[in-house]
Amino acid sequence: MNNSASVLDPAGALSRSDELAAAGLWDDAIRLLTEANRNEERSDVERRLLKLRHLAFAEMKDSVPVPVWPKPVPDYFPQETSIPEIHASELTADIVNSAITHHGSLMVRGMVDPNVAEGIREAIDHAFDSAAEAENPLTPLPPWYLPFRAHRKGDYSFGGPERTYVREGGGLHAVDAPRALFRHIEALSAVGFDRMLRDYFGEPVAFSAKKTTLRRTEPGALAGWHQDGAFLGTETRSLNIWTALSPCGVDAASLDILPRRIDTLVEMGGPDIFDWAISNETAEKYAAKDIVRPVFETGDALLFDQLTLHRTGVDSHMTKTRYAIEMWCFAASTYPHEQIPLCW
C-alpha cells in the first residue's frame, strides 16, 4: 500500500478505509487510518480505527497456534533473584520468554518516551473527566470519551455495569477513550512492541477491550492479591504490559508482585474477599518474603502473564496519583472470547 494517508483528507481516508475493509484488506485499512490520525488527530478516525480492529478479528481466518509454546529457552538472568530488567532497546521475544518462564515477569525501562507519556496522561485526564460528566456510562462526549460498541454478532456483554465496576476501581476502559489508546499504541509501536508480540506468540495478536484499562489511581486505593488466570484461564497464551505513565512506587502506588514463576492457579477465596481473589495468608504462603514492589519511572513497563501473582502496591505515605495503562494481549488462536478482541 502506498502512503496515501499523507495526501488524503480525513473524509477521504475514512472512505478509502471502508473500501479496503470491504475488500478484506484489514491491515491496509488500519494502517491508512493510523497514518491519517498521526497527521491530524480526529475522534471520528480514532473511533473507526477501533471498529476496524474489532471487525478484523471477526474476519480473521483461523489462526494456527505454535505447536510448542512457549518454546524452551535458557535463563538469560541466572543470577537474578528479583525482577529481571532490560532497556526497551534490548527487547526481543526470546528475552521476554526467558524472563516470564524462569522469573514470572520482566521490567522494561524506557518503554515509552516521557514526553509522549505526558500526552497520554493528558488524554487520560480528559477521558476520566468527560466520563464523569456523561449522563451515563454509555453517553459519548467526544473527542475524549466515546463508549465502544462491540459487534452485535459476537454475543458480547459490555454495557454500563462493566464500565461502572471498572470506574469504581479507579479505571476506565481504554477502548472508551480512543485518543488515549491511539497514543499508547503509537508509543509502544515506536519501540517495536507490536513486532515483538508477533514473534513471541508466533501468530497474529489481539488485545482485550475489557482488560485494556486506563489507570488513574488515587492515594489509598486498595486491591487484593490475584492471578488473572482466574478470569482468562490457564491455557490462554497471554502477555500483559503494565506501563507507568508517572513515577510509581515511592509517592504513588506501584504493584506488589511475586518475582518467580507459578505454573498453576493458587487457592482462591476466603472470608470477606471475592471468590477470584487470593487471601493475604495464601499469598504469604507462596511468596514467603519474596514480594517485590518495583519503582517505576515514567515510561517504564512491567510484562507478565495470567499466572503472575500480584496486587496494587500501596502504603499510607503515598500521596500522589498514579497514572498507568494495563494492556492484555493474546495469541489469536487462544483468545478468550468474552474479553472482546481487537487486532493489534
What is the predicted function of each stretch?
Residues 310-318:
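Short beta-strand His + acidic residue motifs that chelate non-heme Fe in jelly-roll/DSBH
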Residues 112, 123, 152-211:
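Signature of the catalytic double-stranded beta-helix
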Residues 225-242:
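Acidic, His- and aromatic-enriched active-site or binding-groove loops in soluble protein domains
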Residues 1-102:
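Fe(II)/2-oxoglutarate
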Residues 215-228, 248, 306-311:
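Conserved short histidine dyad/triad with adjacent acidic residue
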Residues 248-309, 334:
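Double-stranded beta-helix
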Residues 240-243, 319-335:
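A short hydrophobic beta-strand segment most commonly corresponding to one strand
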